[in-house]
Amino acid sequence: MDEILFPTQQKSNSLSDGDDVDLKFFQSASGERKDSDTSDPGNDADRDGKDADGDNDNKNTDGDGDSGEPAHKKLKTKKELEEEERERMQVLVSNFTEEQLDRYEMYRRSAFPKAAVKRLMQTITGCSVSQNVVIAMSGIAKVFVGEVVEEALDVMEAQGESGALQPKFIREAVRRLRTKDRMPIGRYQQPYFRLN
């Protein structure tokens, strides 16, 4: 009757490499392994110890079960990825022109004063603000200013001028970012009707 219900079940006593661990456990528990012609007594003792413990040296023992790498190799690959990223940044910075290098250094050094950001946020919200929120807001403000400055530099380059950024370039950059919907609304609202 088992042959009808389970037609894929093999009657051989030998185990192939593709068999599951559960199948090995059940066959060793039922005593079918003792009748095997291919195993020698030395391997039976080792195999009995492995089956009784449930351990198998050929299987993954790191506990996550989803990959074949141990946990210490995953940490190593994460460290390697961080090191590769650092090397890429070093190559990129080494290929900067003098102007780009100065701009990059100023960007790295620049930050909004946290006390001023905290005071501004507390006056707007009317409640106390934690230090983590202040750090996040100063980072967001730095990214926002970076986008405006980048767009202003594009405007200046498109108009064929060079030198320091002037207010007219920054105003044009803000206007362009508003038309691209990449600028928060703030006080500026587009008119509902246009009279032309």
Swiss-Prot record:
Effect listed in the UniProt record for changing residue 141 to G: Lethal; survival is reduced to five days. Abolishes assembly of the siRNA-directed RISC loading complex (siRLC) and, as a consequence, abolishes formation of the RNA-induced silencing complex (siRISC)
InterPro entries cross-referenced by the UniProt entry: Histone-fold, TAF11-like, TAFII28_dom
Residues bearing the modification Phosphoserine: 14, 16
One BP annotation, GO: RNA polymerase II preinitiation complex assembly
GO terms, molecular function: protein heterodimerization activity
GO cellular component: cytoplasm; cytoplasmic ribonucleoprotein granule; nucleus; transcription factor TFIID complex
Positions of disulphide bridges: none
Subcellular locations according to the entry: Nucleus; Cytoplasm; Cytoplasm, Cytoplasmic ribonucleoprotein granule
SUPFAM superfamilies, alphabetized: Histone-fold
Bias-annotated ranges (Polar residues): 7-16
Region (Disordered): 1-88
Family: Belongs to the TAF11 family.
Assembly mode: Belongs to the TFIID complex which is composed of TATA binding protein (Tbp) and a number of TBP-associated factors (TAFs). Interacts with Taf2 and Taf4. Component of the RISC loading complex (siRLC), composed of at least Dcr-2, r2d2 and Taf11, which loads duplex siRNA onto AGO2 to initiate formation of the RNA-induced silencing complex (siRISC). Interacts with Dcr-2, r2d2 and AGO2. Taf11 appears to form a tetramer which facilitates or stabilizes formation of the Dcr-2-r2d2 heterotetramer.
PANTHER family noted in UniProt: TRANSCRIPTION INITIATION FACTOR TFIID SUBUNIT 11 (PTHR13218:SF8), TRANSCRIPTION INITIATION FACTOR TFIID SUBUNIT 11-RELATED (PTHR13218)
Descriptive protein name: Transcription initiation factor TFIID subunit 11
The species this protein was found in: Drosophila melanogaster
